[in-house]
Amino acid sequence: MIPRIPITDISPAVYFGGEFVAVKAIAGETIAVSATIIIEGHETLTAEVCLYNSKNKMVDCKPLVQNWPGTDRYEGSFTVPAQGDFYFVVKASSTSQYRTVTGESEKYPVHADRDRALIGSWYEFFPRSEGAVRNADGTVTSGTFATATKRLPGVAAMGFDVLYLPPVHPIGISHRKGKNNTLEAQADDCGVPWAIGNADGGHDAINPVLGTMKDFEDFVKAAGKNGLEIAMDLALQTSPDHPWVKSNPEWFNKRADGTIAYAENPPKKYQDIYPINFDDDYEGIRNEVLRIIRLWVSKGVKIFRVDNPHTKPVHFWQDVMNIMREESPEVIFLAEAFTRPAMMHSLGKAGFHQSYTYFTWRTSKWELTEYAKEVAYTTSAFFRPNFWVNTPDINPFHLQSGNPAMFALRAVLASTLTPSWGMYAGYELYEHRAFKEGGEEYMDSEKYEIKVRDWDGATKKGLTLAPFIAQLNAIRKAHPALQRLRNITFHDTDSDAIIAYSKREGKDLILVVVNLDPSYAQGTTVHWNMQALGIDHHDFEVKDLLDGATMTWNPHTFVSLNPARPVGKVAHIVQVKL
């Protein structure tokens, strides 16, 4: 029922599955709130938003103000003080010489996760490739957890926080794929890690080629000593050789002839993978998945990258997420869902902490601006983006020229537009060869074979973007403004080749200007929105965090960026002296 003073259109509010579900936040994050509040006649109103913890104790209460008189739209914010469950209420009152009347909204839940749910730099590598050796006869000896451990300092030196591993479980033998996705594997082909399971075990086992369970535990500990969290792949599918196929045949789809149906995503066919049927033994599958998650959590894994969650029932994920949040609130789930917006958003509402996004395919100034505003404001209550520049599945068209400046500018965009971004190994070496023209698959894809890379040789020759990546991640760590999602403002430029935006958190104000043209120098005037920046004087001093240069800028700043110069000059990332 409408309260005595009607309070409507409250934002943020996330309605899903017949109830309000929690707005996403982290400890210390400030959440903007707005509501339409009306009263009959000409009475004046006061309004506030109050935040309560799970014990119904008020922990914050701030006024709401009608910034645009006549709109009846009241705006303000609250700050979440700690991890955990909270709820907020919008209150209004009006006092006249005759009476005092009040109104109060219903309760809107808020959940604050640990910081990594919002903030992080992610790196992906295949352990079997790290430390792999190409022998004199052309064969390749696989890397192991022991050899991959030697790569951890290099990943940490680039400033990454999370190391994501593709599946490390036993790989199926039946219908194993060969190099470049050929249907017939050779004797030395290692198989696709996502075809999980053979006689050595399934999702709860380690591929013996990589080592033992103890080797994995040692690897996780070594990563921690290097400041890295391990993100494990949770791929709910199997090879034809997985133990589940015999123990629980009801977990799979069967054709009319009684054979199990393999996975298909027309026109692609995955003869080496069986999808799961969640409808015939839902509780059994859920309990088994929870057992698997709990096992790896006990081994030190606190982050899971979930493979293709959009091909599984949304209510299944909501069930799993709710249970895990109660048991282990430190555990984070990233949705690898490159699919329709409604499904991606539903997965976020169901409980996924983060999601892959469309950033990989947003390249123009207009596309980047509109998409960044969407994820920062329209969907941020339930959908946290993680901007990946590439993945083993996606070699974007714009990278296929191999132009180092394009790799640099895309890294700048991904690492400064949102607080979480990711990069797949080889990006820093400018790997770009496509399997076929017009496609986004890598030539000699690491999904199907071991890739031997010469990290030291590339460093000695200066053929690596790693120092620049390290610089970007260091800037991110040093500046709170780049660790928030809901604080981005775009500023007009006179050229579509240059994009400009700002982010502010307290006294930390960062301006970013990027040349989107990797081949030619571009110059333009940037028209800074001084009110949005919170600067009340004409000229302001800035320091470029990429090259240390200090400059004096003004509301209409001419900027020239030449990608032919060192990679730092595909962009300005400047801190404003306040």
Predicted segments with their positions:
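Aromatic- and acidic-residue-enriched carbohydrate-binding clefts of CAZyme catalytic domains
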Residues: 119-124, 129-143, 171-218, 246-283, ...
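Catalytic-core region of carbohydrate-active enzymes that cleave or remodel glycosidic bonds
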Residues: 323-332, 336, 341, 363-437
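Active-site neighborhood of glycoside hydrolase catalytic domains
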Residues: 277-344
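Short, solvent-exposed turn/loop segments enriched in Gly/Ser/Thr/Pro and often Arg
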Residues: 164-173, 234-243, 307-313, 336-340, ...
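Substrate-binding cleft/loops of secretory-pathway carbohydrate-active enzymes
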Residues: 240-250, 314-317, 326, 338-366, ...
